[in-house]
């Protein structure tokens, strides 16, 4: 069986940051890559080229950091948590779960028009600049430089939406996407439903589905004859609760050491995280293997499958698994937000010509 062609995602470099994200934002065509010099050897298909992004996406509203005065004006509750740093800038204590949750609520209100957002104690509190970066890059992936692509007609599936519902919220508010959001935790979906009910701008745009099988990814969620332009996922990172707890402690220790203090008690990570959000049997590698295997069952129903990949060593087994399937295209984007590096792995069973026809049929203005 032939191996998938591997391509790179191209994007323009922004000179200035956009102050706010507009609803149904248009995707600009990426600049054309310079032709390769003669004699240069192209990477082999079994060694995918990884494009590294050392800054946030050019359309990311948080490209220049947090505007705390504007955020406090939009969400006055944030003022309690904002303090000057030794360097004279304003910030919050990122080891304080309540401070981070309040910052998220302020960001969502100021930049994305979400007036009410809350999560249960212990639930995953996502870093919004990094999460919306994923959304922007898969929007570029979907458009493939096609200026006529109507983003607000896209249907998107979020696997494991959690209690925060962050990807449906951002995708709806930035690009006008229609979402199906799934999770194995009914309590998480109940919280997302509450967020939807408290924000009229989200109503009628996000459908929630309970995954009945905690060992499945797409099976039991994607219905017959259903179509999605994109699937998104932030897989559980750890292989056990013990591993997740150790990771939490290590991250908080690093936060405390960066402030010149030490951890005196069992800390809570600012990102939090319930069991299903943090770990699963086999960890990220097994989850991705299941996702890739099941994606073949829905090859003609989903234009692009995508997932975050936190551990670089998990990319190789993913490439190997995709090479065994009839996958046409595999793309990898390595994103960097501060000191954290993560990757978007994307694959499609449709050829470039078929993807163009798909967009013309379903996403034309």
Swiss-Prot record:
GO terms for cellular component: cytoplasm. It catalyses: adenosine(1618) in 23S rRNA + S-adenosyl-L-methionine = N(6)-methyladenosine(1618) in 23S rRNA + S-adenosyl-L-homocysteine + H(+). It is an enzyme of class 2 (transferase). It is found in: Cytoplasm. Its main location: cytoplasm. PANTHER family: RNA N6-ADENOSINE-METHYLTRANSFERASE METTL16 (PTHR13393:SF0), SAM-DEPENDENT METHYLTRANSFERASE (PTHR13393). Belongs to the methyltransferase superfamily. METTL16/RlmF family. This is Ribosomal RNA large subunit methyltransferase F. One of its GO terms (biological process) is rRNA base methylation. It comes from the Bacteria. Keywords: Cytoplasm, Methyltransferase, rRNA processing, S-adenosyl-L-methionine, Transferase. The gene is rlmF. GO terms for molecular function: 23S rRNA (adenine(1618)-N(6))-methyltransferase activity. Residues 1-49 are annotated as: Disordered. It holds the Pfam family Methyltransf_10. Specifically methylates the adenine in position 1618 of 23S rRNA. InterPro entries: METTL16/RlmF (IPR010286), rRNA_lsu_MeTfrase_F (IPR016909), SAM-dependent_MTases_sf (IPR029063). Residues 33-49 have a biased composition (Basic and acidic residues). Gene3D superfamilies: Vaccinia Virus protein VP39 (3.40.50.150). Its EC number is 2.1.1.181. Transmembrane segments: none annotated.
């Amino acid at each position: 069986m032939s191996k998938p062609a591997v391509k790179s995602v191209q994007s323009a470099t922004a000179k200035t940051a956009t102050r706010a994200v507009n609803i149904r934002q248009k995707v600009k065509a990426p600049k054309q890559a310079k032709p390769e010099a003669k004699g240069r050897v192209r990477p082999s298909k079994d060694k995918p080229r990884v494009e590294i992004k050392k800054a946030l996406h050019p359309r990311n509203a948080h490209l220049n950091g947090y505007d705390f005065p504007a955020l406090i004006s939009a969400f006055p509750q944030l003022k309690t948590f904002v303090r000057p740093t030794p360097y004279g800038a304003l910030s919050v204590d990122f080891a304080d779960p309540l401070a981070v949750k309040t910052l998220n609520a302020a960001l969502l209100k100021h930049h994305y028009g979400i007036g009410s957002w809350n999560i249960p104690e212990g639930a995953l509190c996502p870093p919004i600049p990094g999460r919306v970066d994923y959304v922007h890059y898969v929007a570029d992936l979907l458009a493939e430089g096609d200026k006529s692509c109507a983003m607000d007609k896209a249907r998107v599936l979020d696997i494991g939406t959690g209690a925060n519902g962050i990807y449906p919220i951002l995708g709806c508010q930035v690009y006008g996407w229609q979402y199906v959001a799934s999770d194995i935790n009914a309590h998480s979906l109940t919280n997302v439903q509450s967020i939807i009910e408290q924000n009229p701008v989200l109503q009628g745009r996000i459908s929630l589905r309970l995954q009945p099988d905690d060992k499945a990814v797409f099976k039991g969620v994607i219905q017959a004859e259903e179509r999605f332009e994109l699937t998104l996922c932030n897989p559980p990172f750890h292989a056990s609760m013990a591993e997740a707890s150790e990771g939490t402690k290590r991250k908080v220790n690093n936060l405390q050491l960066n402030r010149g203090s030490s951890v005196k008690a069992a800390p809570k990570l600012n990102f939090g995280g319930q069991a299903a959000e943090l770990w699963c049997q086999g960890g990220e590698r097994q989850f991705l293997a299941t996702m890739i295997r099941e994606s073949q069952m829905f090859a003609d129903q989903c234009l692009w499958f995508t997932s975050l990949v936190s551990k670089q060593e998990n990319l190789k087994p993913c490439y190997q698994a995709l090479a065994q399937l009839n996958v046409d295209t595999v793309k990898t984007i390595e994103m960097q937000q501060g000191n954290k590096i993560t990757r978007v792995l994307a694959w499609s069973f449709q050829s470039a010509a078929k993807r163009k026809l798909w967009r013309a049929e379903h996403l034309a203005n």
